[in-house]
């Protein structure tokens, strides 16, 4: 009787320890459809500046993305006293958990990871081939500008791409001033006679003179203006403001015309 009681007592703690281990296994092994997956992304400057940044790679399965997580989990478990390895049994997505203790835990972890990779070898080969095809397509396509080129703060039109400096147009040189008209003696004599008659020309009179002297109306108009200005300077008539300034010594401009100027000027 005493031996049976001792055996029952030994069995009970074993059952309790087994239940605790089963609870731990169930806690760490949720269903395959609800396994949380962490996506690893590299936010380095070199990757951000590339044109293909942000595009989703084709041909990479979900299991390939979890390789790194399984490897890191195996290494961290090898350092601890108890190690649990998730091993996919088949295509259904179910997995079994193996607890390993002792010196052989690192070897078993490596073997299980190699087996799991062996099961998915076809997927890795297909992903490698797809990546090579995408790289060859990228080389065939023309060079794409990175995204930061279209987001510069100095661009007035961000969607138009990088700015190209336009060559400056050569400034059109101004035409030289019209040379002075060299009037003939007959033309000057006729203009002087008309000026003595009347210093200001009407439109009809200017048109008739232009036809008679074979000149432009503007040439006749300019000659009359210059003639009036010369006479005004020669007479020396000054307005009241000029006289007031001269009394204060502030107005000393010469108003007499120089001798020797021809009427053609």
Curated annotation (Swiss-Prot):
Record GO biological process: neuron differentiation; regulation of transcription by RNA polymerase II
Compartments (UniProt record): Nucleus
DNA-binding region, residue intervals: 176-235
This protein's GO CC annotations: nucleus
GO molecular function ontology, one term from the record: DNA-binding transcription factor activity, RNA polymerase II-specific
Region Disordered, residue ranges: 1-38, 75-140, 156-181
Chief localization: nucleus
SMART domains given in the database record: HOX (SM00389)
Protein's UniProt keywords contain DNA-binding: yes
CDD domains for the chain: homeodomain
Compositionally skewed regions (Basic and acidic residues) per UniProt: 1-12, 102-115
UniProt biased composition (Low complexity): 122-136
PANTHER family attached to this UniProt entry: HOMEOBOX PROTEIN ENGRAILED, HOMEOBOX PROTEIN ENGRAILED-2
Protein name as it appears in the record: Homeobox protein engrailed-2-A
Organism ancestry: Eukaryota, Metazoa, Chordata, Craniata, Vertebrata
